[in-house]
Amino acid sequence: MLKQVEIFTDGSCLGNPGPGGYGAILRYRGHEKTFSEGYSLTTNNRMELMAAIVALEALKEHCEVTLSTDSQYVRQGITQWIHNWKKRGWKTAEKKPVKNVDLWKRLDAALGQHQIKWEWVKGHAGHPENERCDELARAAAMNPTQEDVGYQAEA
């Protein structure tokens, strides 16, 4: 039987683009591990993706995961859009390159053999874990220590 793990995520950006951060909580049998990191120049969507990626990459074996995010971009991207992006060679329906392709590929790889249930939660609506992740993300954004090397400014 697979281990049942809960993951909660959030990303934040002070300006978009601007300094950003992510926060994630990984919970298994009442034990929690938190993750957060700040980047000097990034976007909110990149930080939402990073939160999910880092938490999933921390799993050491195949798990049954419930991942809660307040990002429709992440949830819809991974459950609906990614299949066609991959078929089209990482291009959108308009034949444009997929934004944040470096992170979408990394998230796709991080899913591995996990069984994942994606749940959307309304942000800033009192969901305790989402609020904690938001606090982690905002604190990280205020003290960025990393460069988001994959971030590309709009032309």
UniProtKB/Swiss-Prot annotation:
Entry EC number(s): 3.1.26.4
Required co-factors: Mg(2+)
InterPro entries (alphabetical): RNase_H, RNaseH-like_sf, RNaseH_domain, RNaseH_sf, RNaseHI
Positions of Mg(2+) 2 binding: 10, 134
Example GO biological process: DNA replication, removal of RNA primer
Record-level Gene Ontology MF annotations: magnesium ion binding; nucleic acid binding; RNA-DNA hybrid ribonuclease activity
Entry GO CC: cytoplasm
Cofactor remark from the record: Binds 1 Mg(2+) ion per subunit. May bind a second metal ion at a regulatory site, or after substrate binding.
Residue span(s) of domain RNase H type-1: 1-142
Highest taxon of source: Bacteria
Main location group: cytoplasm
First-level EC class: hydrolase
Compartments (UniProt record): Cytoplasm
Residues holding Mg(2+) 1: 10, 48, 70
Swiss-Prot/TrEMBL keywords: Cytoplasm, Endonuclease, Hydrolase, Magnesium, Metal-binding, Nuclease
Keyword Cytoplasm on entry: yes
Reaction catalysed by this enzyme: Endonucleolytic cleavage to 5'-phosphomonoester
Family, similarity comment: Belongs to the RNase H family.
Task of the protein: Endonuclease that specifically degrades the RNA of RNA-DNA hybrids.
Complex formation: Monomer.
Record protein name field: Ribonuclease H
Organism: Citrobacter koseri (strain ATCC BAA-895 / CDC 4225-83 / SGSC4696)
